[in-house]
Every structure is written in structure tokens, then in C-alpha cells.
Amino acid sequence: EQEFHRIRRLPPYVFAEVNAMKARARAEGADIIDFGMGNPDLPTPPHIVAKLTEAVQDPKTHRYSMSRGIPGLRKAITAYYGNRFGVDVDPETETIVTLGSKEGLANLSSAITSPGDLILVPNPSYPIHQFGFIIAGAAVRSIPVEPEHGLLEALKRAVQHSVPKPTAVVLNYPNN
């Protein structure tokens, strides 16, 4: 069995490990209430299915979108951020649309990282925060975030005490 050097560098995928534990517990007869990854357990509402069907049948949607995403969607995203968080984001230079957070973060990691760059990632965080940079060849340092110190203080201390200085620091909302 061939192993690839970038894959070998990855830590175990926490969601796969948790899924395996749930499967073992269920096989042993345990009644599991799953608070894991958000896989839908209800059908998609009919009005959403109808709108999707309508869009799929429209020949204008049978093409690739612009590489940064549909302009109207980018404007709607920036308006949301302005209304929700009070920030001014430019839809032309500060907003892109991706298929999801994993794709976006993996592409960002590859775009801004050179092999050997130091990247600081808070722990806990979403697995792609580490995985994307590891695949890009970076040296990732996991920074434990303790409730008594707080996320920003932990990252600030880590930056101050890092040699070499990090190329990037992942700043995420701790509960995603």
C-alpha cells in the first residue's frame, strides 16, 4: 500500500475517529444521540426543492459562474456582514464564493504558504484549519486555548514567543 508524504503528515481526522466510536457503540447496542457533524436528518423543504429545480432547468445556469462567484451573491454576502457584524467588506476585492469552508480554507492555505512556513492554529478548531496548511507544506503549531486565558490572549502569547515568527495565525470563532 502506497502512502503519500503529505497524507502521512496529517493527524487523525477527528470526525472519522468519532464516527468510528459511534459505530462501535451502536454495534454494541448503545442508544446514541448524535451531536456530531451537521448531516441533515430532515428532508429539504419543498419550496427550496422547487426553486432548485427551477434554477437547474434554466439554460442560463448551465455555464460556469465567474471565478470569484456571482457578483450579486458577493454583494449579498458583504451586505450580510455589514448588517450582522458592522464591518465594511468590498465585494470586488475582499469576497469570493467557494463550494464550502473546506475548499476555501484549503485553497487559501496553498495560496499563502510556502513549505516550512510556521502557522499557528488554535486548539480546538475545525480540522481543515490544520489540514490545509499541513498539505501545503507548512509547519503547524497547535495553540491550546484555555477558558481562563481566552483565544486572543493565547494566540498573542504564541506569536510573541514563536521563533521563527509565524507566516499566518488562524483566527476562528472557537465554536465554529
PLM feature segments, named:
Residues 3-4, 8-99, 107:
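N-terminal small-domain helix-loop-helix segment of the aminotransferase-like
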Residues 135-140:
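A short helix-loop-beta submotif of the ANL/AMP-binding
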Residues 40, 102, 126, 173-176:
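Short glycine-rich anion-binding loops that position phosphate/pyrophosphate groups of nucleotides
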Residues 111-127, 132-133:
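Conserved PLP-anchoring active-site segment centered on the Schiff-base-forming lysine
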Residues 32, 92, 116, 164-166:
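A general structural motif
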Residues 141, 146-176:
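Active-site phosphate-binding strand-loop segment of PLP-dependent enzymes
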Residues 96, 118-120, 141:
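Conserved beta-strand elements of the Class I
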